Structures are given as C-alpha cells and as structure tokens.
Amino acid sequence: NQGRYDRSAYPRNGMRIARKLGVVTYRSAMEWDGRFGRVRLNSEVASERFGMEFEVESYLEAHADRFVDQFDPNCYLYLSRAMDWFDVCQSCARDGDDVVGALATFPLQNALVLGATTDILFPLHQQQQIADGLARGGAKTRFLALDSHQGHDAFLVDIDKFAPPIRQFLDELRKTP
C-alpha cells in the first residue's frame, strides 16, 4: 500500500515478525539459553502442535505486542533501508570494498573501538577493521573485544564491562593537550 496505512490496513503481522527477528539477533545464544533454556510455559499440560509452548515464545510475543503499538512501520522501513544502504567505502569515494582504506581518511586523533564477543550483527572482525582503518589514518586507536553474553545489546546493558574502558578513554582525552 505504498506506506499508506490506517488501523484497518496496519501491517501488524509484519511488524510483529520484524520485532521478534530483531530481538533474537540482538541477543546471544548464551543469553537465550541462560535466561530461558527449554523451559515450558506449563509442563503439565500437553501443548497444541503449533501453539505457544516455551517461555521464550511468550517473551518474544510480549516484545512484539509492545513494539507494534510504539513504532511507526514507515520509520522501521526507512531505518532498515538506511542501514542496508550505508557503505563507508562509497561515502569516501574509495575502492568499493576497502573498509580499512576508507576509514583511514577520517581525520581523528584518538579512537576507542569496542566490540562484544557475542555480537552477531557487528562481529569482532568488523570492529577490528574499524580500528585498523582509523589507526592507518593516524588515529591513536585502542580496540577491545569485551567478553559479554549479551550479544549486540551488550553496549546497552553490560555497563560494568563497557563503562570502565570508556571512562578511561575519556579521562585520557581530558589529559591530552
């Protein structure tokens, strides 16, 4: 419907599925297993063949329900498209796949690049590429791979691991003339 919708034509199912997929990819397998494992909602009752059976399903349903009413579908589409189209190499008019070379053109003096070991959306090898590129451009760069079970969401929720290196980096910047 070309992005035109009202409550009668609202893309509810698509939004719910998008949110569930997002939530699953923001977290790590270790977190899902530690949090939910294979715990059933009600182990005493025989479940429907394709009904909601596990606690993790209930959790994802609740996230999807909240998301549908709080996020505009067109905003979600534009945000998703912007992420798909972003290409640091293209924006620097450099060789099509030379990420390190493109980042070397950024005029930075200092950089801190943090990655979570369990982040599948921005894996450590990509974070290392960022650090390598910034360093090649002359930035005093520090790269840290932080061990976290939180996946992509680690930078939002694993404050005990992310705050100290950020604090140290900012303190060092304040001391630099």
State what each model feature region is.
Residues V113-G115:
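Short beta-strand/loop motif that positions the catalytic acidic residue
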Residues S91-V99, N110-A111, P123-G133:
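Short alpha-helix in the alpha/beta-hydrolase fold that links the catalytic acid
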Residues A62-H63, Y78-L103:
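Active-site nucleophile elbow and catalytic-triad environment of alpha/beta-hydrolase enzymes
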Residues L103-L108, L134-G137:
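Short, conserved loop/helix-junction motifs that constitute active-site signature segments
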Residues Q128-P177:
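Catalytic active-site module of serine/aspartate enzymes centered on a nucleophile-bearing elbow/loop
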Residues R66, M83-F86, T117-F122:
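Acidic catalytic loop of the alpha/beta-hydrolase fold
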